Swiss-Prot record:
Residue intervals of the IQ domain: 778-798, 800-824, 825-847, 848-872, 873-895, 896-925
Binding site for ATP: G164, E165, S166, G167, A168, G169, K170, T171
Name of the gene this protein is made from: MYO2
Myosin motor domain residues: 70-774
Organism of provenance: Lachancea kluyveri (strain ATCC 58438 / CBS 3082 / BCRC 21498 / NBRC 1685 / JCM 7257 / NCYC 543 / NRRL Y-12651)
Protein name: Myosin-2
Region (Disordered): 1082-1109
Function: Myosin heavy chain that is required for the cell cycle-regulated transport of various organelles and proteins for their segregation. Functions by binding with its tail domain to receptor proteins on organelles and exerting force with its N-terminal motor domain against actin filaments, thereby transporting its cargo along polarized actin cables.
Sections of the chain in a coiled coil: 926-1079
Highest classification ranks of the organism: Eukaryota, Fungi, Dikarya, Ascomycota, Saccharomycotina
Region Non alpha-helical, tail domain: start-end pairs: 1080-1554
Gene Ontology CC terms: cytoplasm; membrane; myosin complex
Domain Dilute: residue ranges: 1205-1480
Residues in Myosin N-terminal SH3-like domain copies: 4-57
GO biological process, one term: actin filament organization
Amino acid sequence: MSYEVGTRCWYPDKQQGWIGGEITKHTNLSNKHQLELTLEDNQIVEIESETLDETKDDRLPLLRNPPILEATEDLTSLSYLNEPAVLHAIKARYAQLNIYTYSGIVLIATNPFDRVEQLYSQDMIQAYAGKRRGELEPHLFAIAEEAYRLMKNDKQNQTIVVSGESGAGKTVSAKYIMRYFASVEQNNEENAHHNLEMSETEKKILATNPIMEAFGNAKTTRNDNSSRFGKYLEILFDKEISIIGARIRTYLLERSRLVFQPKSERNYHIFYQLLAGLTNEEKSQLKLTGVEDYHYMNQGGEAQIKGIDDAEEYQTTVEALSLVGISKDTQYQLFKILAALLHIGNVEIKKTRNDASLSSDEPNLAIACELLGIDSFNFAKWITKKQINTRSEKIVSNLNYNQALVARDSVAKFIYSALFEWLVDNINTVLCNPEVASEINSFIGVLDIYGFEHFEKNSFEQFCINYANEKLQQEFNQHVFKLEQEEYVKEEIEWSFIEFNDNQPCIDLIENKLGILSLLDEESRLPAGSDETWTQKLYQTLDKPPTNTVFSKPRFGQTKFVVSHYALDVSYDVEGFIEKNRDTVSDGHLEVLKASTNETLLSILETLDKHAAKLAEKEQVNKKPGPARMVNRKPTLGSIFKQSLIELMGTINSTNVHYIRCIKPNEVKEAWVFDNLMVLSQLRACGVLETIRISCAGFPSRWTYNEFVLRYHILIPSEHWSKMFSSDTTEEDIRDLCRTILGAIVEDKQKYQLGNTKIFFKAGMLAYLEKLRSDRLHNSSVLIQKKVKAVYYRKKYLAIISSIRNFHSRSEGFLTRQRVDLEFKTQAAILIQSMVRSTSTRNKTISLLSAITRLQSLVRKQLAQKELLQRRQRDAAVSIQKKIRAFEPRQSFNTTRRSTVVVQSLVRKKFAQKKLKDLKTEAKSVNHLKEVSYKLENKVIQLTESLAEKVKENKGMTARIQELQQSLNESANIKELLNSQKDEHSKVLQQQKDAHDVQFNEVQEKLVNAKKEVEEAKEEIEQLIAKQDELKAEVRTKIEELNKAKKTFTEFQTQNSDLKNEVKSLKDEIARLQAAVRSGVTSSTITSTPTASRRFSAHSSVADGTSPRQLNVISMNNGGIEDDARSTASALSQINDELYKLLEDTKSLNTEIVEGLLKGFKIPETGVAVELTRKEVLYPARILIIVLSDMWRLGLTKQSESFLAEVLSTIQKLVTNLKGDDMILHGAFWLTNVRELYSFVVFAQESILNDDSYNNGLNEDEYKEYVTLVTELKDDFESLSYNIYNIWLKKLQKDLERKAISAVVMSQSLPGFIAPESSPFLPKLFSQSSHYKMDDILTFFNNIYWSMKTYHVETEVFREVIMTLLKYVDAICFNDLIMRRNFLSWKRGLQLNYNVTRLEEWCKSHQLPEGTECLQHMLQASKLLQLKKANLEDINIIWEICSSLKPAQIQKLISQYAVADYEVPIPQEILNFVADRVKKESSLSSDGKSQTHSSDIFLSVDSGPFEDPFGQIETREFGKIEAYIPAWLNLPITRRVVELVTQHVTVQESQRTE
């Protein structure tokens, strides 16, 4: 061992267990080593020893590990595996909010006493699913996943043993393990998503947790939810590795808790849940009140648990009971039994001198008996009396008061324990029925069992618990030993037998024929057996060799005995051992209970009898041959527990075992507080230190050859390893290099062994190698610095000499130049002075002359302006007078003219109204309508002319107003001009003020007069405006009347047109009927024609895609019109007949559309240079629109429904089945076509609802049918669009998921900053390169962009798709990044930043600047990796920059940072500061509640369902649809339909034109 100055070590401490220190002095005098140790509290300790071997002298301090190893994830990787190193490693990880640590095969789980739900989220389950242990950080799920994989691959049953003392978190750990198994199946199924619902069986398995916790857990001083029983849950799997059921075994329920609770503790949760959750009516029926009223509940004084709502827990329990098949009625019966137990506890027994008495009328007794359905008299009798059965008679005797209390409590405990067993039996019946049992292929067992316990007073319960832990510890030690030796054999290394502490003597002490349990059973079966007698037998039998090594009696007293357990010696108090072991209820009470009228109670007792019978059968089978016994003895609680423990160990030994040791870090249950001494005692008790001791006896540290060479090759000269970088390096070369390294640096060959795949090291060797490596790096860095500094300072010296010489020469030249320059400057100064003086004199003269000239010009200007102003004022006055005098006559004339026009229009209106009445009576005549139409047209023309005249007059008045307004503006300008002139006169001609004042007053008078005139003009203008408004109102009235007249005229036109069409149709029909009669054709061939004709008027406008137009009807005196009308109607009828036949045959049409159009089409190509028209892209939708609209036009509503149902289903199937390269193009293609179809349906709905012209020829029922059909179709297409969008986007996400992590996280595109992905050695064998690059991601986004652009998908939809995918990339890459170990470095940060920046640039180049916001988490994570982390200021900077990251995420990234060899490791103080800041900020954000990890470290991955972005934008506009079918499509029926529709539209258009 090395104790050089500066060596860090550990020294024992009473308060902290161990304290850190450093060797500050080491001397060696007289063969004695004198060490001076400075502790962390500055205390100095001096140690003197003859040896430096810590195993030979306990006074020597224990060596401390290098800082880089102190917070290791696996304790076995510590170089110095000693007690303080293990404690410090767990403490360091706990301080960094890491509650899990490996210790070989054991997972150590330290209770955080905080809410850390994010550690067990579905994202975390998904992260660990399929991962090997060691790939990710230590976690509960890593153990569960390992068990699941081994069961699946090796076909071997598994067991997970969860142990620890009360409050360590065993129950929570077991619960989350069960949740993992219930969730992991879905994560491993193809195309499954982690949000899928669990199966009914899995829900039932998880429902057992709240049930067992309610009936078997209670609040203790150490734990608010302490399990008071042991539980082994087998999760059952079938051949397909699917969960099909479960089985529960329970061990040693703490019966005494029902009747007694220590201070600050509670009874079982279910009682408090009942009182909080039952309704007042139910409480009244059960005669229940408050907690304080019941003896069985008020002894502890703690009725409430902080942060727990018993009413909510009651609802959870009730729901769980219902889920496992216990009906509401049965639940109520259970609650009646529980209420009865509370009333039994309140039964008051009267105390006499020697006996006890109890009346059957005692109120609490009466209520209890009523609820249980038993006889109160007999029940009361057997509380105060006992019966002894002899061979000849039964003897009944009285009990004293204390015995009566025991009898009362015994029957209560008996009923509750029986109820608990009945619950477990019912759960097993539901979860493992015969059908399930027949399909069981394998199972994973989860053992949640009490840890080693030792209190001031230890009783029967602690004895059984510690006995179970002895058995488990023995199995654990053997398992660890076995694994160690298997590893050595597998690697074929030399090894010797590893000694370890075997606790078999302690187990023999308990189990042997003359052991503690046997003597206890023997004494319990004696009627007069007592604790004192049993104690004496123990002393006599066991306090002698060989058992006295593990058994002893205390120095004082005769009521205790001491057992030396593997963890420590425990003193047991014998009081109550006999009574608890008997665990009996009197035969009298048993008979009373079995006579109950409560069927549930009888069922509970029957279950108990069945269990007793099974136990008796097992004892009979296991009984050794010998003389037959006369009596069947009732099994004691100790024997039952022993038998069940033997069965449990048999089960565990037959499975592959995994261990989880739960640690309680402090007694006060305060979040993230670590008590060294308490944890240390638990590490000793749970066997972790023993495991490490076994490992230390062999080769605890092991490295692969490649890892060893990668780290320690620098310890030998480079000529040995430089050639290893070549591509032809083999594994044998690597092994030879390892031998060379070890041979050069390790003298003792016993310190290591070379295996087949690994190198094994003794304890302390890694620290030695690390020291050599750090020394080599230090020496190398010093040498490099020396050489670099030498070169640097020599260059600096030569540069200084050269600069001095240059300075001398340059200084002399500078001084010479300075003298010459001074002479030149002197001459120049004289010349400049002379020039300046002459220039100054010249400028003064010029300035004076200029001022005189300017004054003269100003005077002349003033006089000229005055004369000009007078002239303008005179002209303006004349002009205003002229316009005002002309205004009144003109106004009078216009008024007279308007009045005349109004009178004329009113008269004409009266005549028109009269004429209208006449026209209405003559409307039946078609010829008369024509004449009327012509006259009305003339009337419209006249009215239009009249309106034009009115408008013209209005324009004239407006022009007049504008002229007056202009005059007013001119007057205002005059005023402004005068004011400006006044200012100029005041400044320039101050000396002429008096003369100018006279003139100014005259001008002022004129201005006042002008203002008066302007005011009068304003009043006149206002009057004109008022009159103009009146004229406008009158004109509007006339226009409204004119519009009414035009509307009336339009109605006549419409009626005329309809009548003409009707007449033509009837004539054509008559002609056809006559022709049919003449040719002998039957009437059956034209039965569909009237329907088609009737539908025509309703949907013809939809068929051609144009809006309905009103046509003017103009009378024509052409004799050939009627013949043309007949031929047109005949053509339309023929087209409609053929269309009807084609569309009515939906089977042929559907087959052709589905197979030929939908499934057999070719997607138009996309790309940068490809531009497709809408008809080339949307032809499938438009063909369907044409077919659909004509089906509606011809009344084929039923056929259209079946047709569309087939189309919708086919399109959705096509998108669902998209794979590979077709996914992007086909998805975008169908997205835009479905949008086109949806837009058409919306257009059709709006047309039918808002335009009456579409409804002509439809009765009310037909109209409702069409409205309903279109509304349903709208919903169907909306759903189809939503489904297609979601299916397509999820497929894009799935394709992106394969590429994103490899491209964004793994790929290294930035040259010069490549981080090593693996060892530089063996490049061909071990190199791993990312499968996808960033170019693949950009190509992916480019394909989406061009497909959506080419296929005319709306821009808003494109933006939403890209933003969703970018957020998805950000989330999955960040979640992958944050879970990576030994990966996060500053070089990786640069590469990440470069990769994400390329995505940002793509977004900006495609007009998506907001895309940067979607990638914030990855950007900030990359920045975090690049920033310094050396001090607290750096951490504050990181916190400011990484504003989008949660505190827990920042802490996780920093703690995962992989420090390079040339970097300084992040100090432990910094890591602790970050963790403390996370706790502080989370505490503040949760309003004082302790929720350190209230936020998940994972980002939420949005995997749908997504909102359809089409729902947020307007539908597409519809014009005339161009019929287009590509030539390569084989659609004969569809082509004919389109041709006929085109012909129909052509004929209809020609008819409209005529």
